[in-house]
């Protein structure tokens, strides 16, 4: 039986970061991936002459070489060096305000000053509340950096002295704090646009998590790799190999092995058994506990926690390869949010069923990267999120008809709301549903976002409870369902943070 210092199961963003950190720490590390390529959701696929980005709209916390964000620093520390494109604006949103009457069409730029100035132009009198929001974001980001630097073992007194608002506001929701800041309602509607990126309505979404994400996008901009997410994840895989890591592709981890004390002793795979005392799983915890562990080693607390949590957003994506350029079609924006209403609670409820869900985000990659597809063409994706498991109610015999009808609805709504025509120019079309995510990424209900970051179960308590979040000796979880929640940068940070924690535990064991 081959022996490794650590085994990483799953080569998604979190797993790749964890594997790279373990290898960089000098540990003999094995990375197991059931597919023939890395990435999980962070990948690409081809149809005809088009290569489609599977999932990424834009990555935050990247930044420039001169002013890098934390995510870029981490990946470049591993040796990643690939070309990137910066998205010129943060987003455009076209919708109806929560009052049900006012039309919103707003494009928000990068940099805090320009963002605040544009918000003041759109909603006179909101300047102070928006500026205060970014000031809080600066404090929150600094608090997050401090927590990462000490692997979650924060000093309460230091936190109280340096990050009082982080502690004071950490348990509150977005809308509650917006109201307390006396932010005008129309400004709240616009500022809530990014809620879909975290999959929780603003009445329940963690203010800390949301503002931190917004601050990162505005300060460091949004970025995409030159050749889709596949370039990012294959690049990280190459970094891992260059540091001496071993990779088993087309290999499925089927069972985690334990010793008499219920500590990890190895992994059973379709390629044979492996001996190790440390496993980092880039998988949903519920899947691991239910299918890869004997019941007697699963702590009762983790069963209760799994039942208490709510699965987050389930993706539905329409991929369009169009035989006209973005300019010819009149598509000028990279990202456009197209909800029916700025009332996030209403949109969240509507997103629970196929019949009522009309929310979507349009991305046109060629606006930022003209060479993304062949000359004279462009690639557009329309993404909708489901907030409940309504696709489980679809009869398999009706699946193709149901997904096709919903895709046609999204295309029609996009044309109406954005004011362009794309249907006659569709050369290639592919559809991904929550079932697709279940099949390819092995996530329950297709919930690629992991668990909802809301109320008691947001990033702050997860980070603070890191010590009890992983009670089984030798096993930790990384990725979207882990401590940081969803998002490429969050998944990468979770892998890096928990690998560092594992390295520290190894050092203590050796002492």
Q: Where are these predicted regions, by residue range?
A:
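N-terminal glycine-rich phosphate/pyrophosphate-binding loop and immediately adjacent elements
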Residues: 2-139
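Rossmann-like flavin
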Residues: 99-205
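A glycine-rich dinucleotide-binding beta-alpha-beta segment and adjacent secondary-structure elements
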Residues: 188-201, 357-363, 420-484
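Helical element adjacent to the flavin cofactor pocket in flavoenzyme catalytic cores
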Residues: 214-264, 270
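Mid-domain catalytic core of redox enzymes
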Residues: 254-374
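Active-site-proximal substrate-binding core of FAD-dependent oxidoreductases
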Residues: 258, 504-511
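C-terminal segments that line or cap access tunnels to active or ligand-binding sites in enzymes
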Residues: 325-435
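A conserved FAD-binding loop/helix module that cradles the flavin
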Residues: 480-502
């Amino acid at each position: 039986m081959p022996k490794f210092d650590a085994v990483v199961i799953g080569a998604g963003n979190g797993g790749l970061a964890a594997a790279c950190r373990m290898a960089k720490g000098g540990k003999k590390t094995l990375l197991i991936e059931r597919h023939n390529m890395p990435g999980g959701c962070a990948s690409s696929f081809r149809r005809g002459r088009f290569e489609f980005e599977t999932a990424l709209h834009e990555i935050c916390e990247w930044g420039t070489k001169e002013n890098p964000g934390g995510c870029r620093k981490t990946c470049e520390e591993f040796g990643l060096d690939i070309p990137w494109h910066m998205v010129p604006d943060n987003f455009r949103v076209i919708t109806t305000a929560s009052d049900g009457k006012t039309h919103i069409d707003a494009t928000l730029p990068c940099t805090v000053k320009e963002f605040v100035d544009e918000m003041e132009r759109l909603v006179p009198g909101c300047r102070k509340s928006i500026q205060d929001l970014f000031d809080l974001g600066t404090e929150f980001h600094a608090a997050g950096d401090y927590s990462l630097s000490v692997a979650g073992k924060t000093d309460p007194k230091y936190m109280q002295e340096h990050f009082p608002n982080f502690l004071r506001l950490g348990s509150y929701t977005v809308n509650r704090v917006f109201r307390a800041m006396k932010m005008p309602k129309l400004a709240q509607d616009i500022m809530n646009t990014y809620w879909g990126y975290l999959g929780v309505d603003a009445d329940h979404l963690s203010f800390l998590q949301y503002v931190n994400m917004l601050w990162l996008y505005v300060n460091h901009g949004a970025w995409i790799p030159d050749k889709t997410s596949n370039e990012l994840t294959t690049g990280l895989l190459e970094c891992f190999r260059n540091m001496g890591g071993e990779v088993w592709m087309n290999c499925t981890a089927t069972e985690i092995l334990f010793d008499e004390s219920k500590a990890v002793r190895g992994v059973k795979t379709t390629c044979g058994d492996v001996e190790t005392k440390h496993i980092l799983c880039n998988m949903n915890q519920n899947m691991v506990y239910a299918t890869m562990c004997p019941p007697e080693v699963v702590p009762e607390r983790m069963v209760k926690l799994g039942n208490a949590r709510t699965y987050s957003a389930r993706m539905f994506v329409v991929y369009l390869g169009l035989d006209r350029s973005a300019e010819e079609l009149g598509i000028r924006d990279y990202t456009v949010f197209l909800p029916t209403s700025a009332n996030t609670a209403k949109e969240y409820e509507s997103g629970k069923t196929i019949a009522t869900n009309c929310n979507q985000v349009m991305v046109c990659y060629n606006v930022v990267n003209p060479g993304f597809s062949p000359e004279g063409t462009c690639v557009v994706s329309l993404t909708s999120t489901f907030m409940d498991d309504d696709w489980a109610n679809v009869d398999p015999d009706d699946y193709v008809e149901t997904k096709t009808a919903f895709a046609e609805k999204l295309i029609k709504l996009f044309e109406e709301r954005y004011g362009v025509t794309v249907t006659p120019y569709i050369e290639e079309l592919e559809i991904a549903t929550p079932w697709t995510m279940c099949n390819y990424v092995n996530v329950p209900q297709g919930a690629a976002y992991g668990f909802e970051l809301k109320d008691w179960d947001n990033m702050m308590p997860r980070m603070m409870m890191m010590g009890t979040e992983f009670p089984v000796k030798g096993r930790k979880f990384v990725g979207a369902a882990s401590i940081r929640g969803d998002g490429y940068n969050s998944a990468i940070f979770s892998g890096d943070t928990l690998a560092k924690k594992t390295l520290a535990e190894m050092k203590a064991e050796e002492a």
